[in-house]
Amino acid sequence: MTAPATVPAAVTALRDSRLGRAARARWAGWGSPHLRKIVLVGLGGSALLALGSLGAGAPPVYDPVKRTPVLALLRDPIGERAALAFVYAGLAVLGMAWLYLGRALRRGEEGTDTGRLLKIAALWGAPLVFSVPLFSRDLYAYAAQAQIAHAGLDPYRFGPVSLPGPFLDEISGMWVDTPAPYGPLFLGIGRAVATVTGDRVVTTVFVMRLVAVAGVLLTARYLPRLARAAGGDPRVAVWLGVANPLVLAHFVAGGHNDALMVGLVVAGLTVAIEATEERWVAVGVVLCSAAVLVKAPAAVAVAFLAWVWAGRLSGRAVLVRACVRTGVVAAVSITVITGLTGLGFGWIDQLNASSQVLTWVSVPTAIGMLIELLRGVPNFVTYQDPVIAAVRFGGQVVTAAVLFWLWLRAGRAGWVRMLGLSLLAVVFLGPVVQPWYVLWGLTVLGATRLDRRAWLVFAGTSFWLSMMIAPQGSNLFLDWAPVIAMPLVAAVATIAVLGRSRDEVVEPVAAPGKLVVSAPPGDRELGPVASVR
């Protein structure tokens, strides 16, 4: 009868020990009790996602989970349904914790400084580093393309079908003949990974995920500095660009190489905007050029760095001279890096490889689909439909015009904000939109000064898009149930949590770690297109 009493006694002894007191003191340093609850809830959501990935994620064909006692239960029909519930519950819990974290930030609660927010993001992301790939099978495609390059084949001429073996088994039939659409820097990194990991699928996929995580770490390192230089709030930037459930679910758990592109862009922008000498602006151009050699949309960032260089020049025609210098440095950087990889420029011919995907979130694709629907074309059309192709081409023309207009406005409206809007224009006016693409522009815009409307729009969009890909990677944008339900859920949750702070607006920090809260801005304050440096 005395045995049960020993358990509380042991717990009490541990709590009162030196180790227990140190642990409690360290935990108390995470902020207010309310914030600590938010941290634990978010960690619980992330853990649920990782657990659910074992049964509902995107495992390899030769699945080690099936051969592991106990975990194999998640692969039977009942276990898979339970795992699916874990994933969606975890995503919802993580998303709500993130919204409440944003609310705590707006209110200036203890522990919402930049450093603590970065630690919270790291804590939430840690379980997902070790999960089965979630919301995409792109990691397997990266691994297969890395093997092709490692085998000495041209990844811009040959698809995964050219190299039979365990990696080919992981690729969807839709993509087996498709050459790599990514830049030579990314494929060069993949080739180096394949040299070390060999033909071990799970190991190769895990290391390729670490490449994406490295991109997130780059963003975490430089984004607060970019926000300070651009007149934004570093804490808001971290909340939107690092702790965001879109980042955790798709950049970490999904392992998309967009994470590396965004990290290099943010690093390049930061080095350039902080530069006191022209050579450091050139370094920023080199970093953004390296991002282009991961994914092509980073070229937009290179173009906007001409405005930074122009600010370091004096005399006549400074913008023209800055454009020339930016272009020369970018061209030399791209040529040298491409030459070092030995992979050539064949990736340029593959930039439209993803156009086989149809989603109504792409404005041109949605217009084309609507036209065909009104014409009575049965069911959904394919990407080869002439109307879809024509409208998409028109979208590219409009995109070019919009980008040029935003670039011209950068001198008056702030180049960082105009760059963020330009990247969003590339996404929504492009032929294909995937949820994580929004992070291209959202991360940059998070570094600028945001009003309450921008908070609500960006937060609601992030929450909504984080739920629009099934755990195994299938797109939900053509399924009417989630298309209708998910935006409503995201809007209600965002407004309920963030829309209540009407009387408080976080201003840009006066110094790192110092919070300034003021009354709501009047009409004279600039909103989503405010001028920033």
Can you describe what each PLM-predicted range is?
Residues 200, 229, 335, 353-429, ...:
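Aromatic/glycine/proline-enriched transmembrane-helix motif characteristic
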Residues 449-533:
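Aromatic-enriched
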Residues 83-85, 184, 198-218, 385-394:
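Loop-to-helix entry region of an early transmembrane alpha helix in multi-pass inner-membrane enzymes
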Residues 110-213:
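Intramembrane catalytic core of multi-pass membrane enzymes that act on lipidic substrates
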